[in-house]
C-alpha cells in the first residue's frame, strides 16, 4: 500500500470506479472509430483553458482521456465536434470571457446540432453560475466541476445522448484519482500535482470553496509519476498545489514537502525541479535547507505577499505580518544567495489606504522581486472580503496599480541588466512563438532567454551568453 494511504482510503477513487470509467472510454472510442470509418475523419475537440497551472494540468488530463477516446485536437472551434471550456473563478475577467465564448457558440450549435459543448472547472463549483448557464446558455450540453474530473468519460457519454444539459457538480472535497491519462505536449517540462485544495481561507479568495480542503497524494504515487517522466525524457518538473508547503500535513505520519523534495531530487533523468505555490506562513526552515542542498531544485521561488501592510494582511487572513515576510526573505537569501523571487500582489483590497499601499511599494524596494503578478482587487461572491465596507474606488485602484507597475518594471529591468555579458544555463524548451528561427528557454532562476539554435537542442541544457536585456526577457547566443 502506498505510503500514508492506510487511514486515507476514502480520499482515493477506487480501482473499480476507475475501471468503470475505462469502459466508458472504450465505448466512446468505438463510436468515434465507426464515425471515422464512415466519414474518413477523426472526431475533433477544442479545449480552452483559463486560470492557473492547476487548471492547465487538469486540461492535460482531459486531453489524455480524449486521446484514449479517439479524439484529435484542433484550435478551430468551427470544425470541432466537442468544445470544452475549463474555467477559472479567481478573477471576474476570466468569468466574463467564458460567458462571451459561450454566447458566440450558439449559432454554431444551431448549424451543428451534434456539437457537444462542455464547461468545467472552478466556475462550475458556484451554484449561481451553473443556474445562470442553464438559463442563459441552454445550448451547453455538459457542466461539471473540479472534484469529479475522472468521471469525464461517463459524463461525456451521457451528454452525447441527452436532450438536456447534463450537470454533475459536487460540493464535497473530492477524491484523488490516480492513473488518469495525461497528454503532455512539449516533452521537456511537466507538471506533477502533489496535493489538492486549500485550508487557508484568505478572505479575498474563492479557491477553498471551489477546490475543497487540502488532500495530499501519497509520496509513493508522486515519486512513481516523476520516475516515469524521467524515463520518458522529461527534464524539468514543477510540483503543483494550491499551497505545496502544506503537503503531507493531512497524511499524519510526519511526511513533509521538504522530504518530498529530497526524494524527487534523487530521481534519474530529471534535471530541474520547481514548485508552486508557496504560502509564506508555511515555508519552513527545513524546506529552505532542502532547496539549498538539492542540486536539481532551481534557484527560483514564487512567494506571494499580496499586500505590504500588516493591517491589510490581517484583513486578508494571511497570518503573517510585513516584518514576518521581510525576515523570511532575508533567511531565504542568506541560505540561497542567488535566489530569484517572484510574487503576487493585490491592489485595492477593501480598506486599503495610501499609507497601506506605501507599505506594498516598500516591500518591492526592500525585497526586489524579479517579477510580480499584479492584480486589481476583484470581488468574489461568497468570500468575506466581498461583504467588507470601505471598498476602494476603481479610479484609485487603477492609479495605484500604475505606480506599482512602474516600480516593479524598473526593478525587473535593473535585475536583468546585471545579466548582460554573463553566461547562463538554459533549458531549451522550443521555438519562439514569434520567430521560427529563434528558440526559447529558461534559466534556473526562471528568466526567459531567446537565442538562435536548432531543433536538435530542444530538451537540452545549453550555456548562453547574454547580449541583450529587456524588462521581461533576455537575448543571447549559445556558447559552443
UniProtKB/Swiss-Prot annotation:
TRAM domain boundaries: 417-480
GO molecular function, one term: N6-isopentenyladenosine methylthiotransferase activity
Ligand binding ([4Fe-4S] cluster 2): 198, 202, 205
Cofactor binding comment, as recorded: Binds 2 [4Fe-4S] clusters. One cluster is coordinated with 3 cysteines and an exchangeable S-adenosyl-L-methionine.
Residue intervals of the Radical SAM core domain: 184-414
Pfam families: Radical_SAM, TRAM, UPF0004
Binding-site residues, [4Fe-4S] cluster 1: 52, 88, 122
Gene3D superfamilies, sorted: Methylthiotransferase, N-terminal domain, tm_1862 like domain
Catalytic activity: N(6)-dimethylallyladenosine(37) in tRNA + (sulfur carrier)-SH + AH2 + 2 S-adenosyl-L-methionine = 2-methylsulfanyl-N(6)-dimethylallyladenosine(37) in tRNA + (sulfur carrier)-H + 5'-deoxyadenosine + L-methionine + A + S-adenosyl-L-homocysteine + 2 H(+)
Domain MTTase N-terminal: 43-161
PROSITE patterns recorded: MTTASE_N, MTTASE_RADICAL, RADICAL_SAM, TRAM
Domain of life the protein comes from: Bacteria
Alphabetical UniProt keywords: 4Fe-4S, Cytoplasm, Iron, Iron-sulfur, Metal-binding, S-adenosyl-L-methionine, Transferase, tRNA processing
Location in or out of the cell: Cytoplasm
Top-level class of the enzyme under EC nomenclature: transferase
Main location: cytoplasm
Function, in words: Catalyzes the methylthiolation of N6-(dimethylallyl)adenosine (i(6)A), leading to the formation of 2-methylthio-N6-(dimethylallyl)adenosine (ms(2)i(6)A) at position 37 in tRNAs that read codons beginning with uridine.
Family the UniProt entry places it in: Belongs to the methylthiotransferase family. MiaB subfamily.
Self-association and partners: Monomer.
Name by which UniProt lists this protein: tRNA-2-methylthio-N(6)-dimethylallyladenosine synthase
Species for this entry: Acetivibrio thermocellus (strain ATCC 27405 / DSM 1237 / JCM 9322 / NBRC 103400 / NCIMB 10682 / NRRL B-4536 / VPI 7372)
Gene this chain is encoded by: miaB
Amino acid at each position: 500500500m502506498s505510503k500514508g494511504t492506510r487511514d486515507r482510503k476514502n480520499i482515493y477513487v477506487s480501482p473499480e470506479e476507475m475501471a468503470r470509467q475505462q469502459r466508458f472510454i472504450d465505448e466512446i472510442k468505438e463510436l468515434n472509430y465507426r464515425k471515422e470509418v464512415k466519414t474518413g475523419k477523426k472526431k475533433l475537440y477544442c479545449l480552452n483553458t483559463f486560470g492557473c497551472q492547476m487548471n492547465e494540468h487538469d486540461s492535460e488530463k482531459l486531453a489524455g482521456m480524449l486521446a484514449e477516446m479517439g479524439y484529435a485536437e484542433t484550435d478551430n472551434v468551427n470544425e470541432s465536434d466537442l468544445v470544452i471550456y475549463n474555467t477559472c473563478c479567481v478573477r471576474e475577467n476570466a468569468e466574463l470571457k467564458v460567458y462571451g465564448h459561450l454566447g458566440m457558440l450558439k449559432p454554431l450549435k444551431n448549424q451543428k446540432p451534434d456539437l457537444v459543448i462542455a464547461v468545467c472547472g472552478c466556475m462550475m463549483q458556484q451554484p449561481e453560475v451553473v443556474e445562470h448557464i442553464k438559463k442563459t446558455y441552454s445550448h451547453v450540453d455538459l457542466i461539471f466541476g473540479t472534484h469529479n474530473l475522472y468521471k469525464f468519460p461517463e459524463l461525456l457519454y451521457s451528454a452525447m445522448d441527452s436532450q438536456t444539459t447534463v450537470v454533475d457538480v459536487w460540493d464535497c472535497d473530492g477524491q484523488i484519482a490516480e492513473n488518469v491519462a495525461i497528454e503532455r505536449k512539449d516533452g521537456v517540462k511537466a507538471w506533477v500535482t502533489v496535493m489538492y485544495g486549500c485550508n487557508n481561507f484568505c478572505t479575498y479568495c474563492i479557491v477553498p470553496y471551489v477546490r475543497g480542503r487540502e488532500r495530499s497524494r501519497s509520496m509513493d504515487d508522486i515519486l512513481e509519476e516523476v520516475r516515469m517522466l524521467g524515463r520518458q525524457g522529461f527534464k524539468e518538473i514543477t510540483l503543483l498545489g494550491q499551497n505545496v508547503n502544506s503537503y503531507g500535513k493531512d497524511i499524519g505520519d510526519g511526511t513533509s514537502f521538504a522530504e518530498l523534495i529530497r526524494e524527487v531530487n534523487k530521481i534519474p533523468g530529471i534535471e530541474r525541479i520547481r514548485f508552486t505555490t508557496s504560502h509564506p506562513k508555511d515555508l519552513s526552515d527545513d524546506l529552505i535547507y532542502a532547496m539549498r542542498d538539492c542540486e536539481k531544485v532551481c534557484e527560483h521561488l514564487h512567494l506571494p505577499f499580496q499586500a505590504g501592510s500588516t493591517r491589510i494582511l490581517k484583513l486578508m487572513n494571511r497570518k503573517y505580518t510585513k516584518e514576518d515576510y521581510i525576515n523570511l526573505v532575508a533567511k531565504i537569501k542568506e541560505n540561497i544567495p542567488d535566489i530569484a523571487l517572484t510574487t503576487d500582489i493585490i491592489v485595492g483590497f477593501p480598506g486599503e489606504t495610501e499609507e497601506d499601499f506605501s507599505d506594498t511599494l516598500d516591500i518591492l524596494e526592500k525585497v526586489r522581486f524579479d517579477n510580480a503578478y499584479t492584480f486589481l482587487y476583484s470581488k468574489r461572491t461568497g468570500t468575506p472580503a466581498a461583504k467588507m465596507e470601505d471598498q476602494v474606488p476603481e479610479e484609485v485602484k487603477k492609479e495605484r496599480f500604475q505606480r506599482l507597475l512602474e516600480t516593479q518594471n524598473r526593478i525587473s529591468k535593473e535585475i536583468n541588466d546585471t545579466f548582460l555579458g554573463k553566461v547562463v544555463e538554459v533549458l531549451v524548451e522550443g521555438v519562439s512563438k514569434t520567430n521560427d528561427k529563434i528558440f526559447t528557454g529558461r534559466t534556473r532562476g526562471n528568466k526567459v532567454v531567446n537565442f538562435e539554435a536548432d531543433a536538435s537542442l530542444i530538451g537540452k541544457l545549453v550555456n548562453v551568453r547574454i547580449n541583450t536585456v529587456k524588462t521581461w526577457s533576455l537575448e543571447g547566443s549559445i556558447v559552443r
